[in-house]
Amino acid sequence: MAAAVAAAARGCWQRLVGSAAPARVAGRPSVLLLPVRRESSAADTRPTVRPRNDVAHKQLSAFGEYVAEILPKYVQQVQVSCFNELEICIHPDGVIPVLTFLRDHSNAQFKSLADLTAVDIPTRQNRFEIVYNLLSLRFNSRIRVKTYTDELTPIESSVPVYKAANWYEREIWDMFGVFFANHPDLRRILTDYGFEGHPFRKDFPLSGYVELRYDDEVKRVVAEPVELAQEFRKFDLNSPWEAFPAYRQPPESLKLEAGDTKPEAK
């Protein structure tokens, strides 16, 4: 009886396992070969490139022309990038009127200030470019508003239009030194008290002007001028194993004695 039950159980087990029945591997005991799903765990690293949408491109271009017609006093340039992003360059005096128009107009409704930053281009007369990135959740659209200024001319604060511009403008003032007029609390936000200069300017030295260290004698952190003095060092880059020494050393020129104007012809 027991033998019959064992045989029935063994037959049922073989039917359930099917192709995954026990098999004998050479040199090893019997193992159960189970199907294994082999897939590469490496993620696809190809960049995601949005295709150009001709319909959206035309709509943004038409809207940019519409804004230029409504505010011709302030809008100086309108362009649409290849990724369907509208850019409007305005006069510095038009920050409040243009941003208010884009926020409140029924066909715009750019009610969110996604980002506010600056770019330093020292070769320009107005070296600082202020960039406002706006978002319209109603129309799922973005727009970039650009204006410009120099080291001394202030820009009107956009805090009355977008409350989110408060800390953005403080950061621009701290990093670039662009002054925003009528800002409710324009003070440094990232650097320490008494910091000299503005670190994101292209003419700011990489080492800075002062360094902070803990003074064990006075038991506090002190600020001292940066000192990067070192002895003169000469680096000899020539090597006896140089494969192409001609590219390392310039060809020797004939030495002329006093009074000679050209070397003698041989």
Swiss-Prot record:
What are the EC numbers? 7.1.1.2
Q: Name one GO cellular component term.
A: mitochondrial membrane
Location in the cell: Mitochondrion inner membrane
Q: Where is the transit peptide?
A: 1-38
Q: Please tell me the species this chain comes from.
A: Bos taurus
Q: Name one GO biological process term.
A: reactive oxygen species metabolic process
Tell me which domain of life the UniProt entry assigns to the organism this sequence originates from.
Answer: Eukaryota
Reactions this protein catalyses:
a ubiquinone + NADH + 5 H(+)(in) = a ubiquinol + NAD(+) + 4 H(+)(out)
List the InterPro entries.
Answer: NADH_DH_suC, NADH_quin_OxRdtase_su_C/D-like, NADH_UbQ_OxRdtase_30kDa_su, NADH_UbQ_OxRdtase_CS
In the record, what terms sit under GO molecular function?
NADH dehydrogenase (ubiquinone) activity; NADH dehydrogenase activity
Q: Which cysteines are joined by disulfide bonds?
A: none
Q: What is this protein called?
A: NADH dehydrogenase [ubiquinone] iron-sulfur protein 3, mitochondrial
Quaternary context: Core subunit of respiratory chain NADH dehydrogenase (Complex I) which is composed of 45 different subunits. Interacts with NDUFAF3. Interacts with RAB5IF. Found in subcomplexes containing subunits NDUFS2, MT-ND1 and NDUFA13.
Which gene is transcribed and translated to give this protein?
NDUFS3
Q: What family does the database annotate?
A: Belongs to the complex I 30 kDa subunit family.
Where is it mostly found? mitochondrion
Q: List the PROSITE patterns.
A: COMPLEX1_30K
